[in-house]
């Protein structure tokens, strides 16, 4: 045990980190003078403890034990008291674009500053008038942002990231859906460096179900510019998702219904989402919403559930917000204003599939559904108690005056791929894509095996190179291993082997407790029946999800290639470097 920055750290806890996690820490999160990941954990814990070293000690202990992990910017940009400017602890933002030249120009400037500061950005373009003889429509302006993403680097090699949101009723929606597809259309209007997302309304989904026509209306005048078959437009959206992974689908009416009453009374509204579709906060000409994230490790739930950690993390994230408010540059004034007014945080989770597998529970089971409900109800209850207590101690946030809360929102589940590596658990609330794969990042290549499967194989005396080679040859599957019981085969099914209605089922049931949203991916082998793909997407809307993130396919993927992100962008393969670093909650 050693005293460091006013708290006690344990260098022996480095042994809890995998080689991959240790490499990631040293290459991306530790400062030059830091000799151990423990010092980096301590730096972040103390930097945002608000002067309460007892809280800093507890936060350090939680992180160093792998019970939770800081979002990437919270950890990498935490100051160490030497007066140096390490950047901001928040790097995910939601913006709004108005239908006037001043707003368009202002948006370009804001995106530039957000990108320079390491931010990933989601932008809503639905109010920008469509293409006509007097207006170019929103896509040429998106093309400007597309170029900005290559101009403003974040770190040594990573470019900026931006997701554009457009309403399904917008006159330019058909071109927008395909602006990442490399073939067809004007290449000068393609936006390969952006991600696209469609705001899908309840009326549109009803029109799809009833097979009626759908009007595309100019947001400036409200008049119909074109009429299309709703089902044909929906089919184009799903086909683009199957080909490129996007557009994300944002069920905007569902999100708006769940905006807190206090904010609805203030006339606020949700217009879109963020880069990873888990943040659902109000935006406007005056507000750029911010995502203040970190994630608990569900695989260690039995260790931390009665520790008080969840309450401490809400307090900690409130401190992180305050640091952002105090130190963000004036160019981020809209983001600072939003953070000050609503103080929303997004405590997330990772390790859900690993938690189930550690208990031998199959994903496709009502036992899994019961565990899912229990976990997220507990996290929400503890978070709510914490924000009530903070309101008493520190005061209500301005948006929540009279409601007794310090933070308007508490929970949001981000992709958190890097955080899951550091904690040695499965990513986010996703099913594992493979039981064995080579994880390639700029930090190097690492073979990753499912530790719970490894335990099962060991119990059979089958933890051998030959067996693991057969798993790799089977694209990460264990269904061919005859010595495993059917219950074990069910527990170790991979994402592409699962019935995706269960992915949606679990997401829908936990959404009751997630005041913001979830980065929910769906997984379909190539050749999946289109009717089933449609069925899963319809279920997501009917069951009350706020959105769907990527549609992932098996095209070109093997157990060797599978990582934490299997996206298709302009038909090129990705490595895990291109996972949204801004949402590493």
Task: Annotate each predicted stretch with a short phrase.
Residues 1-585:
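Extended catalytic cores of very large enzyme megasubunits
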């Amino acid at each position: 045990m050693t005293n460091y920055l006013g708290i006690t750290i344990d260098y022996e806890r480095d042994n809890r980190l995998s080689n991959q996690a240790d490499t990631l820490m040293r290459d991306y999160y530790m400062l030059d003078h830091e000799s151990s990941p423990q010092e980096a954990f301590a730096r972040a814990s103390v930097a945002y403890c608000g002067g309460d070293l007892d809280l800093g000690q507890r936060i350090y202990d939680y992180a160093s034990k792998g019970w939770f992990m800081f979002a990437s910017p919270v950890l990498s940009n935490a100051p160490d008291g030497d007066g140096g400017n390490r950047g901001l602890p928040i790097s995910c933002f939601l913006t709004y674009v108005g239908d006037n030249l001043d707003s368009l120009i202002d948006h370009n400037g804001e995106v530039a500053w957000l990108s320079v500061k390491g931010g990933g950005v989601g932008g809503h373009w639905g109010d920008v008038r469509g293409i006509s003889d007097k207006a170019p429509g929103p896509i040429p302006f998106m093309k400007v942002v597309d170029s900005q993403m290559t101009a403003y680097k974040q770190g040594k090699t990573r470019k900026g990231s931006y997701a554009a949101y457009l309403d399904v009723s917008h006159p330019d929606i058909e071109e927008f859906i395909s602006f990442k597809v490399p073939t067809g259309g004007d290449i000068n209007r393609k936006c390969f460096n952006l991600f696209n997302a469609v705001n899908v309304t309840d009326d549109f989904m009803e029109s799809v179900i009833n097979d009626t026509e759908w009007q595309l209306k100019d947001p400036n005048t409200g008049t119909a510019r074109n009429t299309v078959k709703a089902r044909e437009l929906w089919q184009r959206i799903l086909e683009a998702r199957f080909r490129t992974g996007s557009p994300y689908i944002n069920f905007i009416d569902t999100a708006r219904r769940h905006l807190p009453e206090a904010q609805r009374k203030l006339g606020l509204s949700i217009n879109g989402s963020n880069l990873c579709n888990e943040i659902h906060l109000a935006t406007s000409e005056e507000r750029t919403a911010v995502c203040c994230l970190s994630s608990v490790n569900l695989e260690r739930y039995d260790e931390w559930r009665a520790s008080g950690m969840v309450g401490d993390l809400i307090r900690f994230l409130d401190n992180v917000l305050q640091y952002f408010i105090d130190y963000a540059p004036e160019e981020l004034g809209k983001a600072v204003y939003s953070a000050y007014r609503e103080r929303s945080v997004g405590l997330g989770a990772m390790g859900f599939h690993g938690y189930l597998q550690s208990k031998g529970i199959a994903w496709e089971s009502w036992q899994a559904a019961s565990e899912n409900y229990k976990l997220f109800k507990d996290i929400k209850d503890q978070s709510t108690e914490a924000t009530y207590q903070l309101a008493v101690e520190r005061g209500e946030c301005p948006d929540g005056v009279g409601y007794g809360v310090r933070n308007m929102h508490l929970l949001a589940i981000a992709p958190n791929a890097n955080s899951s590596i550091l904690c040695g658990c499965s990513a986010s609330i996703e099913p594992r894509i493979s039981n064995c794969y080579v994880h390639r990042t700029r930090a190097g290549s690492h073979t990753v095996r499912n530790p719970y499967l490894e335990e099962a194989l060991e119990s059979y005396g089958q933890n051998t190179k030959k067996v693991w080679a057969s798993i790799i040859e089977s694209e990460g599957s264990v269904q061919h291993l005859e010595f495993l019981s059917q219950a074990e085969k069910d527990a170790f099914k991979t994402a592409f082997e699962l019935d995706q209605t269960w992915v949606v089922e679990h997401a829908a049931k936990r959404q009751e407790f997630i005041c913001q949203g979830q980065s929910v991916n769906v997984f379909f082998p190539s050749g999946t029946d289109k009717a089933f793909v449609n069925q899963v997407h319809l279920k997501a809307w009917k069951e009350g999800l706020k959105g769907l993130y990527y549609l992932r396919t098996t095209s070109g993927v093997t157990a060797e290639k599978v990582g934490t992100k299997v996206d298709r962008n302009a038909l090129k393969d990705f490595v895990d470097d291109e996972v949204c670093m801004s949402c590493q909650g």
